């Protein structure tokens, strides 16, 4: 079941919302949300409901054991993390790993045909964060299994995030207020997210698919950029739209999830981009991988290695194929570049800000257009289609304007020629 389906909008959501509103007491409300979340998941994946419940039960028990057996807690949390990662490997990466082994060593191991459970990357990361936080003492182990299961399976953030930490919603699971103002804000936010998904992302996606489906040799520079920018904004409005809907649904039921996107295309570096894009995932890797590896406390070389490892894992998390692996490496390389080259760390004026926005968008754009094409060597060579000299101003204006919601009129100030040309390209720049 997806948020934009008629079943969800016209049947599921009204019933769950009304039931949650009229039921007295937090226990009844939680039971309603838990039942609804399991039905929501079972609608598309009835078999894998058992898998999700089993995962929640195992992590619930691990957390209790960590709290009870303090002298053995390091071993317990290690086993918990290994089992959670094994769950991902089996259901998400088994086919990819088998194919890779067969290709590299000429073996003929049968490739397992395992259907990927919806949301497994999200609920597994949430479960791991819960157990690790109990180990660290960030929160106590929850004695009530139903509350842990509700935290892991809560339907608004189950499919596409944001990834929620237990201590961020613990108090709201225990007691929360469903106010008229919160419901109104939630409905507005949900509608905004639904509009992003249906009215913008889907249209951008059709444009990108049509253009990327054409032979690369038949595309001119302008058309190639239209395809790249369309896909760039398709994934943003799709993913941020789902996050908006999840946050809005949370408000409607009295929960407050953290923001997951913060105008990422206004970033002036790849480092800043990842502070604004899929914030819950970036913060998860920061807290549970980057900092334990040493963070930036052991010199630049070690910092770069740590960042590279994190983005290698980020790429693998996004998908089980070589394309996502190289996509993670690609971003990791630019993060290392920004760490070593002083130019990226120095403050600058408006001109440098505009240049850095263009640089960031070029890097991100080239990365996503290659990800759009499932095989890396068939990626559309967008950046190789250098526009004619007379077109530089046009592309500058598109990129500077797409960099964020506010650029202070910089494109108009830099050159009358650039601004005059902008009017001519708005048809494919917006």
Regions found by a protein language model. Name each.
Residues 1-402, 406-407, 411-430:
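Membrane-embedded transmembrane alpha-helical bundles that form the catalytic cores
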């Amino acid at each position: 079941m997806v948020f934009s389906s008629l079943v969800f909008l016209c049947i599921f959501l009204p019933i769950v919302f009304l039931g949650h509103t009229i039921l007295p007491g937090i226990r009844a409300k939680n039971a309603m949300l838990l039942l609804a979340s399991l039905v929501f998941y079972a609608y598309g994946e009835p078999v894998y409901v058992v898998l999700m419940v089993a995962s929640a039960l195992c992590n619930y028990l691990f957390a209790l054991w960590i709290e009870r057996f303090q002298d053995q807690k390091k071993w317990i949390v290690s086993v918990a993390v290994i089992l959670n990662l094994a769950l991902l490997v089996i259901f998400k990466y088994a086919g990819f790993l088998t194919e890779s082994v067969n290709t590299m060593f000429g073996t003929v191991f049968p490739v397992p045909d395992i259907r990927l459970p919806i949301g497994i990357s999200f609920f597994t990361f949430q479960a791991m964060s819960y157990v690790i936080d109990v180990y660290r003492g960030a929160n106590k182990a929850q004695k009530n299994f139903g509350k842990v299961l509700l935290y892991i399976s809560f339907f608004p953030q189950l499919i596409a995030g944001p990834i929620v930490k237990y201590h961020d919603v613990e108090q709201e699971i225990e007691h929360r207020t469903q106010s008229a103002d919160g419901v109104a804000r939630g409905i507005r936010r949900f509608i905004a997210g639904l509009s992003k998904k249906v009215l913008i992302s889907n249209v951008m996606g059709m444009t990108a698919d049509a253009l990327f489906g054409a032979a690369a040799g038949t595309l001119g520079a302008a058309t190639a950029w239209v395809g790249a920018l369309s896909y760039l904004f398709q994934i943003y409005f799709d993913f941020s739209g789902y996050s908006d809907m999840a946050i809005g649904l949370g408000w409607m039921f009295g929960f407050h999830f953290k923001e997951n996107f913060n105008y990422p295309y206004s970033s002036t570096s790849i480092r800043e981009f990842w502070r604004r894009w899929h914030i819950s995932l970036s913060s998860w890797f920061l807290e549970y991988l980057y900092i334990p590896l040493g963070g930036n406390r052991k010199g630049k070389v070690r910092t770069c290695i740590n960042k590279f490892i994190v983005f290698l894992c980020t790429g693998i998390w996004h998908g089980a194929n070589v394309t996502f692996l190289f996509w993670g490496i690609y971003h990791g390389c630019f993060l290392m570049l920004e760490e070593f080259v002083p130019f990226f760390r120095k403050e600058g004026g408006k001109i440098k800000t505009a240049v850095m926005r263009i640089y960031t968008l070029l890097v991100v754009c080239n990365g996503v257009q290659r990800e759009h094409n499932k095989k890396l060597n068939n990626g559309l060579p967008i950046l190789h289609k250098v526009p004619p000299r007379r077109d530089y101003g046009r592309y500058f204006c598109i990129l500077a304007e797409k960099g964020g919601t506010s650029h202070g009129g910089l494109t108009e100030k830099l050159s009358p020629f650039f601004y005059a040309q902008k009017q001519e390209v708005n048809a494919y720049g917006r």
